């Protein structure tokens, strides 16, 4: 968070993130929404409820949703994927264990949105509207 504040105030360049190896399978094909759901409050539950209500739209927008909790990564909806939760948390500079976070990743592998609070599906869809519909490279 401090890095983000410094970047906003003085324009210091952000460190380029290494894309997590276990998310490479989505690069150029899908958008990925990661929910860090270890928080000991109701934020993960609220976020999951909001996303479940928007399930069909998430499918239409080619968004895979994963929840990271307890050292594991789990698909919020149907498919099971082999993901390395610790690598994702580290490389995407996710919140520390025990904290809530949300990260939206575009098809290009770049982080498009971060939040430490649950976001309504419409907020996520607005962020998606700013992204290309199809991958520019494969």
List each language-model region with its residue ranges:
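Non-catalytic interaction/Regulatory regions outside core domains
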Residues: 1-138
